[in-house]
């Protein structure tokens, strides 16, 4: 009798454990399937990367000039906004981004002194070129806004205002800046909506890239040629102190064999 009861208990226990064993097998099966799926996804990702690398090797991008390389050909600045005399001996070309904090720092700390000492005295031509960085979402439209203000003779006024209000240059803010500058609002908005300066800004970016520029602010300094183009002799990258600009500019303003400016 005892053996019979023991056998019945064993059977009952096995009957109770069977669903658990089945569930464990199902769980293991699910885990195995997930592992296989994950492995397949990984293999697909690796395969895609290999395919991308193969395409890149087949069509390599054009090599960009080294960061310290200077443009071999003079740069045309005939259609760019500038300050100072058009026929100045020396030109400074700024490639900048209205949303860039380093550009804002340069505009606050160095730019005013350069304007006072070299532009207002007629010694240099100061040229602006756009280089809105792709990770600054407001930079492109801000650049277009400055050129739209330029149609009403206030490019530099908008330039100054955008840098003074870098935290408020989203698309919705631009009409407010136009109003503060007393621009014709409808003309400004029509210009901004048209996007007609986007192509010119893209050309500025291309020129910067060909000159080995990849960040802002960057500056090309050189001598103005008879046709108005600029033969670059110096490159400065970053919000450099005034002294570095002064050194580069004074060397070009000094006569051959002469000393620096007093």
What does each model-found stretch correspond to?
Residues 92, 158, 188:
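Divalent metal-coordination and catalytic microenvironments
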Residues 98-179, 184, 251:
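Structural alpha/beta surface segment adjacent to cysteine/selenocysteine redox centers
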Residues 82-83, 169, 236:
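Short clusters of hydrophobic/aromatic residues that line enzyme substrate/ligand-binding pockets
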Residues 25-134, 202, 248-262:
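Extracytoplasmic thiol/disulfide redox context detector
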Residues 28-39, 43-44, 176-262:
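C-terminal cap of thioredoxin/glutaredoxin-like
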Residues 9-19:
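Bacterial N-terminal signal peptides
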Residues 1-11:
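Bacterial N-terminal signal peptides that target proteins for export
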């Amino acid at each position: 009798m005892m053996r019979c009861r023991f056998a019945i208990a064993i059977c009952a226990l096995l009957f109770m454990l069977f669903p658990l064993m089945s569930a464990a097998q199902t769980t293991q099966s699910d885990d195995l399937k997930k592992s296989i799926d994950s492995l397949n996804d990984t293999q697909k990702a690796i395969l895609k990367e290999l395919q991308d690398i193969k395409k890149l090797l087949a069509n390599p991008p054009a090599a960009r000039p080294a960061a310290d390389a200077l443009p071999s050909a003079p740069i045309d600045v005939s259609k760019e906004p500038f300050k100072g005399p058009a026929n100045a001996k020396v030109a400074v070309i700024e490639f900048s981004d209205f949303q860039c904090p380093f550009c804002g720092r340069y505009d606050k700390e160095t730019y005013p002194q350069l304007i006072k000492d070299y532009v207002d005295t007629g010694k240099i031509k100061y040229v602006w070129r756009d280089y809105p960085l792709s990770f600054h979402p407001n930079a492109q439209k801000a650049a277009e806004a400055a050129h739209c203000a330029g149609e009403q003779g206030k490019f530099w006024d908008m330039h100054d205002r955008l840098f003074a209000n870098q935290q408020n240059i989203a698309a919705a803010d631009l009409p407010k800046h136009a109003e503060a500058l007393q621009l014709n609002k409808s003309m400004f908005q029509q210009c901004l909506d048209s996007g007609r300066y986007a192509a010119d800004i893209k050309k500025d970016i291309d020129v910067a890239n060909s000159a080995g520029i990849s960040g802002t602010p960057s500056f090309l300094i050189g001598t103005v040629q008879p046709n108005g183009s600029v033969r670059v002799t110096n490159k400065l990258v970053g919000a450099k102190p005034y002294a570095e600009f002064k050194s580069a500019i004074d060397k070009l303003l000094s006569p051959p064999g002469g000393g620096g400016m007093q």
